[in-house]
Regions:
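A sensor for short, sequence-defined functional sites
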Residues: 1-218
Length: 218
């Protein structure tokens, strides 16, 4: 059960099962469904609106510097995260469910990423994609017999800027990529500037359910 509050011409959805979801947002599990609302001696039947995928956004920005003088070479820098909607509720729940002595580790934005750097003969291969999102969860396409359901509709943005030391030049960047299906979109872009590389990835899940026949393409 949940509560609908009407205040100053606006409607707020209060659901105690989502401790950290702002009242302006509606849990995706009940979006688009009909609700019976008490209205004095009568009642109202309302259809709860369905919000866009962008209402639940997770944006993660990394700013690195390639450290060629460390052993092993590494990407060192900081991370900044901004989340909204159900994604924000998920992260806040994760934080508060973590033992207090470990909560500080979750808030640490200092990154030292050695796994993203491979070197040989004075050349460096950098992996800009952080690879942590729904799109990288493995799905067994050979034995699965049912549709696959993603956690929620959302928009995920990953941006990575890597500062390159003087004396080095970018010799290769992957081609940009964009694909769009009924379930969502995935796009990646790379560009090089004066002394830096910039990577941007946008993933938008518009429909949570992936039909069994479409799983191999996904």
């Amino acid at each position: 059960a949940f509560c609908l509050l009407f205040h100053q011409g606006k409607r707020y959805c209060l659901d105690a099962t989502y401790r950290y979801l702002p009242p302006e947002d509606i849990p995706q599990g009940i979006q688009g469904r009909k609700a019976l609302v008490e209205n004095g001696d009568s009642c109202l039947i309302l259809t709860l609106p369905q919000q866009d995928a962008s209402a639940s956004t997770d944006s993660l920005n990394y700013h690195y510097r390639l450290m060629t003088d460390s052993n092993p070479p590494t990407l060192k820098g900081t991370a900044t995260r901004v989340s909204t909607g159900e994604y924000k509720e998920y992260l806040l729940s994760l934080y508060h469910d973590t033992p207090k002595e470990k909560q500080t580790d979750l808030l640490n934005n200092q990154i030292n990423n050695t796994a993203a750097v491979q070197s040989a003969d004075g050349e460096y291969c950098l992996e800009a994609d952080p690879h942590e999102d729904f799109f990288h969860q493995p799905i067994d396409t050979t034995r699965r017999k049912q549709d696959y359901l993603l956690p929620w509709r959302c928009r995920i943005v990953r941006e990575v800027t890597i500062d390159i030391p003087q004396g080095y030049a970018v010799s290769y960047l992957p081609a940009d990529f964009h694909i769009e299906t009924n379930q969502g979109i995935l796009s990646c872009s790379y560009r090089a500037g004066a002394g830096y590389i910039h990577f941007r990835k946008v993933m938008e899940i518009r429909r949570k359910r992936i039909p069994l026949a479409l799983i191999p393409a996904w």
